[in-house]
């Protein structure tokens, strides 16, 4: 399971280095095989171990090709999806269309989200953190059925 936010850099070839703490689990459990696609709700990328992505594909397969919203969702997620593999130095080559979608330049944030990573432009990550804090502080969490009993 992936957690924590790591500041990383993109090199001139559009590669990122996966932080060392994730490399061995990704290699041993997933053979370094990953799938990267776009997030449909934010300008970031989603990076899944290949077996986790298979679960997403199974869900996408159940969506209708005749219902416009479902078809659009499939088109976005599958149209941008790329199978990628970590090289011997723990690096991933990000396809140019994905770098463009997420507006990635040199500084980025790799954020663990249990079964996947989010990859953000560093400035956009900081802005969305502030936005998320504002939303959480303005909400009545007790009114949200799923969060009513959530405590830390």
Swiss-Prot record:
Q: Which GO terms describe its molecular function?
A: DNA-binding transcription factor activity; transcription cis-regulatory region binding
Q: Name one GO cellular component term.
A: cytoplasm
Pfam families documented for this protein: MraZ
- Does the entry feature the keyword Transcription regulation, yes or no? yes
- SpoVT-AbrB domain: from which residue to which, for each copy? 5-52, 81-124
Any single biological process term in GO: negative regulation of DNA-templated transcription initiation
Q: How does it assemble?
A: Forms oligomers.
Q: What is stated as this protein's family in its record?
A: Belongs to the MraZ family.
Protein name, please?
Transcriptional regulator MraZ
Q: In the record, what lineage is assigned to the organism producing the protein?
A: Bacteria, Pseudomonadati, Pseudomonadota, Gammaproteobacteria, Alteromonadales
């Amino acid at each position: 399971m992936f957690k924590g936010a790591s500041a990383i850099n993109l090199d001139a070839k559009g590669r990122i280095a996966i932080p060392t703490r994730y490399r061995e689990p990704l290699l041993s459990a997933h053979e370094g095989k990953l799938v990267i696609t776009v997030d449909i709700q934010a300008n970031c990328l989603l990076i899944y171990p290949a077996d986790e992505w298979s679960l997403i594909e199974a869900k996408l397969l159940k969506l209708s090709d005749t219902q416009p919203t479902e078809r659009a969702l499939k088109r976005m997620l599958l149209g941008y999806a790329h199978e990628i593999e970590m090289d011997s130095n723990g690096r991933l080559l990000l396809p140019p269309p994905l770098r463009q979608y997420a507006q990635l330049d040199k500084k980025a944030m790799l954020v663990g989200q249990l079964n996947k990573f989010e990859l953000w432009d560093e400035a956009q990550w900081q802005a969305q953190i502030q936005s998320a804090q504002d939303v959480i502080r303005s909400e009545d969490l007790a009114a949200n059925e799923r969060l009513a009993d959530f405590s830390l």
